[in-house]
Amino acid sequence: MADLKALAEAIIKGDQNTAVEITKSALKEGAAAKSILEDGLIAGMDVIGSRFKKNEVYIPEVLIAARAMKMAMELLAPALAKAGVKPVGKFLIGTVQGDLHDIGKNLVAMMLKGAGFEVTDLGVDIGPEKFIERARATSSQLIGLSALLTTTMPGMEKTIKALRAAGVTAKIMIGGAPVTQGYADKVGADGYAPDAASAVDVAKRLVA
């Protein structure tokens, strides 16, 4: 019987080799792909997420755990597709035009993947047109806009207005160091997250 508790532990520790080995043997033993995902990988990332919120672990530990999850997911993805396991939701993310910062955005993308979302990461310095085009192409239910500078924050409002004018109905979340709940309300965003772990909670709430 596959030890999915040990798989969750391997993710928490960021032990890529063990995570991959347990995923391999679980698949070989015929464990359900959905169970490997939820009771192993997502369970481990959930623990990391809540520890991150409490400042018990920091960005390097989260990145190491996310990397272990990514390696295991590469093995698991074909089995999930075959079993018809759907993602929790489809999430499109990018840093707005004029802003080249990506650490926070990358962290949010990793945490969302860790929570079972299908994530399309557009990268940095993304204009409204690109967001519109990819939102349509991916049928994303959620769009995340990131900005790390007060000077690039207006790009969020511009992008939200453009998305709405183009008829994109996806829920829009914003975040980044200078961003606040007040600003999110002002520019008409559907959600705001102060950090990567909270972003997962907000995203889950918006797709529920």
What do these predicted ranges mean?
Residues 58, 100-101, 152:
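Alpha-helix N-cap/loop-to-helix initiation residues
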Residues 80, 84-89:
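Immediate post-signal peptide segment of exported/extracytoplasmic ligand-binding proteins
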Residues 1-81:
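Long amphipathic alpha-helical segments
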Residues 42, 97-99, 178:
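Short glycine-enriched loops at secondary-structure junctions
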